[in-house]
């Protein structure tokens, strides 16, 4: 992704625009596997291969929730599974922080640990790749057909580890006044209604928070002419979320 801090398609003439090890882009990883709107019977589209590079650790960890819902043994969502399987995920170490970064308070490190195929790090104009899956190893083997790769020295590996440690310590200092995530449930239960009333006053039910958050997995399936089945992300903030046949709302 480029200077706009959005994922962008990499072309030969835009390779130099890639920003490495920067905080997360505005586009969540979720939208690649569960788009806001998609035709779920368009098999050709879902069979396209792609590489998603520069994914922060927080987004990779959030994928656990989506996988738990859409790859559950009881029923595996075929569209979501194809989107996942046809993607090579390259996670990125975070070397700088944004104002609201607080992954460590949730037990997440500022460098990839799960749900990715490779990790990318940039130190002193040298790109380091670490394989984390069989898919990642196969991709490295393909890359070696076109360019030379070298094993890092022990000092280079230590430099990467030192940078990770420094960023993690900076995050811990920055968020030292935040509560432990294990206490979040108790804090919510004891907060009362006033705080929810305060924030609901400015909510316009746009559903943007649900669209980007990996904990929100609801969708609505619409059937259109020509055997087109369109899945839309749904959200409990939408005024019509609870409506059923004939426009009835059982929660009112």
In which residue ranges do the predicted regions lie?
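Ferredoxin-type iron-sulfur electron-transfer modules in oxidoreductases and energy-metabolism complexes
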Residues: 177-201, 219-252
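Iron-sulfur-associated redox domains of electron-transfer enzymes in respiratory
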Residues: 1-187, 191-196, 214
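Local cysteine-cluster metal-coordination motifs and their immediate loop/turn environment
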Residues: 56-61, 104, 201-220, 231-241
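A sequence-composition feature that detects small, non-aromatic residues
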Residues: 26, 166, 208-211, 235, ...
């Amino acid at each position: 992704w480029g200077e706009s801090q959005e994922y962008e398609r990499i072309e030969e003439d835009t390779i130099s625009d890639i920003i490495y090890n920067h905080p997360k882009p505005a586009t969540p990883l979720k939208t690649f596997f569960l788009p806001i709107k998609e035709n779920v019977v368009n098999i050709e589209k879902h069979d396209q291969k792609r590489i998603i590079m520069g994914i922060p650790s927080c987004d990779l960890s959030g994928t656990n929730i989506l996988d738990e819902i859409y790859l559950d043994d009881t029923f595996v969502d075929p569209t979501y599974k194809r989107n996942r399987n046809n993607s090579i995920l390259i996670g990125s170490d975070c070397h700088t922080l944004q104002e609201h970064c607080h992954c460590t308070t949730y037990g997440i490190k500022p460098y990839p640990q799960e749900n990715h195929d490779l990790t990318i790090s940039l130190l002193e104009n040298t790109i380091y790749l670490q394989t984390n899956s069989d898919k990642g190893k196969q991709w490295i083997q393909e890359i070696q057909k076109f360019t030379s790769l070298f094993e890092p020295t022990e000092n280079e590996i230590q430099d990467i580890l030192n940078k990770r440690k420094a960023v993690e310590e900076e995050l811990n200092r920055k968020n030292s006044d935040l509560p432990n995530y294990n206490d979040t449930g108790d804090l919510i239960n004891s907060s009362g209604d006033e705080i929810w009333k305060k924030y609901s006053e400015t909510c316009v039910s746009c559903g943007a928070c649900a669209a980007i958050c990996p904990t929100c997995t609801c969708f609505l399936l619409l059937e259109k002419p020509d055997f087109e089945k369109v899945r839309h992300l749904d959200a409990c903030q939408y005024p019509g979320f609870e409506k059923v046949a004939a426009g009835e709302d059982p929660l009112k």
